[in-house]
Swiss-Prot record:
Protein name (database record): Blastomere cadherin
Organism this protein belongs to: Xenopus laevis
CDD domains, per database record: Cadherin_repeat
Domain Cadherin: 158-265, 266-378, 379-489, 490-595, 596-706
Positions of transmembrane segments: 707-730
Propeptide boundaries: 27-157
Cytoplasmic-side segments: 731-884
Gene Ontology molecular function: beta-catenin binding; cadherin binding; calcium ion binding
Length: 884
């Protein structure tokens, strides 16, 4: 060790210091420039036994507090030990020491809240030499690899490797030693040390290193707890040949926090609200701040809140308070008035070290919300209005109020009430936009009854007042304006019974109307507004209603024996008033309709016919209807029989003898209960059938219904259309005869280009596709311009697969074609385009290129007509041509 280390940690100085601490428990002197903390970062207490009893004193730690207060709060990292207020370290319960040293930490806080820690090592001197024990009491801690155990021997569980604590932001010098790693195998051979893990060979790399031979572990630069709170490394020990001599030992380096970060508010501006008029102690809002420093093991991250400024400072400077721990802002004063001060801005401070450290400032804006502490007041408080009579829903007056509360809130919204509203003639509502009261008429006012109304209206808010306030009242004087009112029928609805046999001009009723304008003398005139059947007449002057003699209870205009007419009455005022009334006539029935049977046409079989049931109806009502009586007349009783049923509402009609097929007319005489008789002719058709006849079959065969006739005609028309389409199709399918030869001026672009012109015949060049196509494409038909000579069809040789035989193929097929009289003129082997006169290739000898020595005479082609002229020119010719 160098002289500096001996000077800093002499064992004699340490023993003297401990004795001094025992004699002088506290020094009540405040030294200027004092640095608080433990006097040493590491303490080693040696014992000479493995087991330590409870209450045994191990040693003492010294804390420099730089104040006159007595310090007494320590935090021990091992629950088996405790520290007295004066720094004495005692055994709290029975402890058994093993081969490893027992290590733990002791922490405390100074007056500013800064945490300080020191490392404690309890060493059993039986496992250390005397020199090592003396060295450990004054040097940096030494970590020894635990002993290996083989076999089934159980490992000791109380071997604890204390963490190495390093303060962040240390100034150095660097590299700085932290701890020495030792192995007991150094006694046997040379040991080399290394470390791996976080901060060594894994990111962040290079922070820690170890001297290979001495085992001193070093830190190379200042640490930052906000980046990494701790580092976990593994120490290794190997021999000279690279073999591991110890199991890897885990080392934890804990970074001790320093107060190097200011608090930060979580928002630039905090906003809250509180209602005016609330009681002190009401919670308003909260602010919050964060600090990256440690708030668990130190006060570096413990934040305290305070209010620095209130703007405005009205009505008192300190209206609000803040909880220094939680940041909750509450109201502590009274006098909040939104109408005067709608908003407060607080400047708040967050300070770490529980209020004694670094600070940050923020803003808290508190909005004062409205309370219903202002009553609405009428402005003005008296109104006059003129209202025409008989108007319902007429807007009488709009009433205005003034309310100092916040517009649009329930504390501002006005609610109007009519204090006295006799008869319910008026109604008042609130305009949601302007907050005005709208006074309207709920019923029509009558000038003749009352000419003026005085109304008192009160106003409040939609929510109750937060404080006792007076209620404002307004007075509205309403004057009724006289207008010409329409006359009124008395009664409005008149009901009269009248017989349907009312004679023309006979009085039905005298209608009466009254004019509400009693102070005016006006003439009334009566009219009929709506008379659907035009049965009535009214006297314009006196309102007497008479009939025109056409009333009919059985008319379609009469519903449920009643006939309704709308009556009108007018006055001669300005403007003319028109009143409406209703006249309901209850039409009394008379026996003016006789009973009739139904149906009046039916069919019946000639064999065992079923009786025909006829229903009897009468347009009248009882007692002018049933019971009915029936009889037959005009000779119908000779062949037919009529009987009533038990109820007397229907009859059965049946023949008395077998009837022949045909149509019969039956005269049925019916009478009602009042002997009103009605003769009706019923037509019966007798069919050849037996039993019940629905329709006569002869009718079905002889005659057809219109739909059946239309279907038949449609089918015939469709058949004709299909026949015409078929004929057109067959006509289009006829073969059109094409000309055998092309016209003279019709040229074909089938010119074969010869490589040399005028160089003589080249009859060895063959276009095999043309030859093959010319033979195979012959139409399979007989000539129709001359009578053909019946000959056998020539046999053409198929094209050989061997190219060497192509010459024989051409000669044989050419000879067969020359001897084929059935071949048409256009079935030539080659077709050449006309190249004009004077062509150097005017003579093409393909026709004479056959190897056959037989000569053919084609002059007969000239006798076949103009169509074969070109072919005769090609194959025929005179002797001069042959010589050429």
């Amino acid at each position: 060790m160098g002289g500096t280390d001996k000077f800093r940690y002499p064992s004699v100085w340490l023993c003297g210091l401990l004795c001094l601490l025992q004699v002088v428990p506290s020094i009540n002197v405040d030294v200027s420039g004092c640095q608080p903390g433990f006097s040493s970062a590491n303490y080693t207490f040696s014992v000479n036994r493995r087991e330590l009893e409870r209450g045994r004193k191990l040693g003492k730690v010294n804390l420099v507090d730089c104040t006159t207060r007595k310090h007494g709060l320590y935090d021990v990292g091992d629950s088996r030990f405790r520290v007295l207020p004066d720094g004495t370290v005692l055994v709290k319960r029975h402890v058994k020491l093993h081969s490893k040293d027992t290590r733990f930490t002791i922490s405390t806080w100074d007056a500013r809240g800064i945490k300080h820690s020191t490392n404690i090592s309890v060493v059993n001197k039986r496992h250390r030499s005397g020199e090592e024990a003396r060295s450990r009491s004054s040097e940096l801690p030494v970590l020894t690899f635990p002993e290996k155990h083989t076999g089934l021997k159980r490992k000791k569980r109380d071997w604890v490797i204390p963490p190495i604590k390093v303060s962040e932001n240390e100034r150095g010098p660097f590299p700085k030693r932290l701890v020495q790693i030792k192995s007991n195998k150094e006694k046997l051979s040379k040991v080399f040390y290394s470390i791996t893990g976080q901060g060594a060979d894994t990111p962040p790399e290079g922070i820690f290193r170890i001297e290979k031979e001495t085992g001193w572990m070093q830190v190379t630069r200042p640490l930052d707890r906000e980046e990494y709170e701790k580092y976990v490394l593994l120490s290794h020990a190997v021999s000279e040949n690279g073999a591991s001599v110890e199991e890897p030992m885990e080392i934890t380096v804990t970074v001790i926090d320093q107060n190097d970060n200011r608090p930060k508010f979580t928002q630039p501006v905090f906003r809250g609200s509180v209602r005016e008029g609330v009681q002190p102690g009401t919670k308003v809002m909260s602010v919050s701040a964060t600090d990256d420093d440690d708030s668990i093991d130190s006060l570096n991250g413990v934040i305290a809140y305070s209010i620095l400024k209130q703007d405005p400072e009205e009505p008192i400077p300190n209206l609000f308070t803040i909880n220094r721990e939680t940041g909750v802002i509450s109201l502590i004063g009274t006098g909040l008035d939104r109408e005067k001060f709608p908003e407060y801005t607080l400047t708040v401070q967050a300070a770490d070290l529980d209020g004694a450290g670094l600070t940050a400032e923020g803003k808290a804006v508190i909005e004062i919300t409205d309370a219903n502490d202002n009553a609405p007041i009428f402005d003005p408080k008296t109104y006059t209005a003129l209202v025409p009579e008989n108007e319902v829903g007429f807007e009488v007056q709009r009433l205005s109020v003034t309310d100092l509360d916040m517009p649009g809130t329930a504390a501002w919204q006005a609610v109007y009430k009519i204090r006295v509203n006799e008869g319910g003639f008026f109604n008042i509502t609130t305009d949601p936009e302007s907050n005005q009261g709208i006074l309207t008429t709920a019923k029509g006012l009558d000038f003749e009854v009352r000419k003026q109304y005085v109304i008192q209206i009160t106003v409040e808010n939609a929510v109750p007042f937060s404080v006792p306030l007076p209620t404002s009242t307004a007075t509205v004087t309403v004057t009724v304006e006289d207008v010409n009112e329409a006359p009124v029928f008395v009664p409005v609805v008149s009901r009269v019974d009248v017989s349907e046999d009312l004679t023309r001009g006979e009085k039905i009723v005298s209608l009466v109307a009254q004019d509400p304008d009693k102070q005016q003398i006006q003439k009334l005139s009566y009219f009929i507004g709506n008379d659907p059947a035009r049965w009535l007449t009214i006297n314009k002057d006196n309102g007497i209603v008479t009939g025109n003699g056409n009333l009919d209870r059985e008319s379609e205009y009469v519903k449920n024996n009643t006939y309704t007419v709308i009556m009108l009455v007018t006055d001669d005022g300005v403007p003319v008033g028109t009143g409406t009334g209703t006249l309901i006539l209850h039409v009394l029935d008379i026996n003016d309709n006789g009973p009739v049977p139904s149906p009046r046409v039916f069919t019946m079989c000639d064999q065992n016919p079923e009786p025909q049931v006829l229903t009897i109806t009468d347009a009248d009502i009882p007692p002018n209807t049933y019971p009915y009586s029936v009889s037959l007349s005009h000779g119908s009783e000779l062949t037919w029989k009529a009987e009533l049923d038990s109820k007397g509402t229907s009859m059965r009609l049946s023949p008395t003898q077998q009837l022949k097929k045909g149509d019969y007319s039956i005269y049925v005489l019916l009478a009602d209960a009042q002997a009103n008789r009605q003769l009706t002719v019923v037509n019966a058709t007798v069919c050849i059938c037996e039993g019940k006849a629905i329709k006569c079959q002869e009718k079905l065969v002889a005659g057809f219904d219109l739909p059946i006739i239309l279907v038949i005609l449609g089918s015939i028309l469709a058949l004709l259309i299909l026949s015409l389409l078929l004929l057109l199709f067959l006509k289009r399918k006829k073969v059109v005869k094409e000309p055998l030869l092309l016209p003279e001026d019709d040229t074909r672009d089938n010119i074969f280009y010869y490589g040399e012109e005028g160089g003589g015949e080249e009859d060895q060049d063959y276009d095999l596709s043309q030859l093959h196509r010319g033979l195979d494409a012959r139409p399979d038909i007989m000539r129709n311009d001359v009578v053909p000579t019946l000959m056998s069809v020539p046999h053409y040789r198929p094209r050989p697969s061997n190219p060497d035989e192509i010459g024989n193929f051409i000669d044989e097929n050419l000879d067969a074609a020359d001897n084929d009289p059935t071949a048409p003129p256009y079935d030539s082997l080659l077709v050449f385009d006309y190249e004009g006169s004077g062509s150097e290739a005017a003579s093409l000898s393909s026709l004479n290129s056959s190897n056959s020595n037989n000569e053919h005479d084609y002059n007969y082609l000239n006798d076949w007509g103009p169509r074969f002229r070109k072919l005769a020119d090609m194959y025929g010719g005179d002797d001069d041509d042959d010589e050429e």
